């Protein structure tokens, strides 16, 4: 008793110190139904993106979709259930106007992040085509991203050569498929990434797409602080 033994109860609490705000800009043009990924480009992306979202517990995420125009699917939120539900509901025909407006998709994403006070602001922009629609030039949108301190990772999605893609509509409303050349403006995507301090990736199949999102996940790590508390229980009791 004179030695006054102590019993230590040690507990740990993790406190998030610096979260990241991430907007995923997704091309939803009809070509995203091409079957060079399984079962098609869009569904392959949704599966990989869902895993990515689940791996970011400390960050806020948002979704933007674009084809000939763009709009916000979900604003920045820490509610992963909401983001995953919105991701699952994305279809090629949610935006009626056809085409691929990369500049619009990027500009809308910048708009979602410009007021953010996060220590790191990131856009992951994915497309399977070339910029052929919209009234905002992709380079102008890139300059806006730089102005607001936003890094852009770009992903070109699609195999090399020809891909089985929608070429018309049948009377029953289903797409007719045919072999179509894969055309991705890689030079533009590389320029966007380089201008904003990000990286460009090319995904030619499902596994490569998964590897790319894993790589971005490693590059953009959330910083956390760990606090340890020690509670002492005095073994000695005075008489």
Model-based region annotation:
Residues 79-82, 170-173, 218-221:
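Short, hinge-like loop/turn segments at secondary-structure boundaries
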Residues 4-120, 136:
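Membrane-embedded segments
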Residues 20, 58, 148-151, 196-198:
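Short glycine-/polar-rich loops that comprise or flank the Walker A/P-loop
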């Amino acid at each position: 008793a004179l030695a006054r033994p102590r019993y230590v109860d040690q507990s740990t609490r993790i406190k998030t110190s610096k979260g990241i705000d991430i907007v995923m800009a997704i091309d939803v043009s009809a070509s995203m139904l091409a079957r060079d990924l399984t079962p098609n480009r869009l569904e392959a992306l949704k599966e990989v993106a869902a895993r990515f979202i689940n791996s970011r517990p400390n960050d806020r995420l948002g979704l933007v979709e674009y084809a000939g125009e763009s709009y916000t699917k979900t604003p920045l939120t820490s509610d992963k259930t909401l983001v995953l539900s919105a991701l699952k509901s994305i279809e090629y025909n949610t935006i009626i106007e056809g085409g691929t407006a990369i500049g619009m998709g990027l500009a809308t994403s910048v708009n979602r992040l410009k007021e953010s006070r996060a220590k790191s602001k990131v856009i992951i922009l994915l497309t399977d085509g070339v910029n052929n629609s919209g009234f905002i030039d992709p380079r102008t949108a890139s300059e806006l991203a730089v102005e607001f301190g936003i890094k852009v990772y770009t992903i070109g999605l699609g195999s090399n050569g020809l891909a089985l893609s929608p070429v018309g509509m049948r009377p029953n409303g289903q797409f007719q498929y045919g072999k179509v050349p894969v055309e991705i403006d890689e030079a533009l995507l590389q320029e966007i990434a380089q201008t904003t301090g990000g990286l460009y990736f090319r995904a030619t199949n499902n596994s490569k797409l998964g590897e790319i999102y894993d790589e971005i996940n490693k590059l953009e790590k959330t910083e956390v602080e760990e606090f340890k508390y020690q509670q002492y229980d005095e073994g000695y009791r005075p008489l």
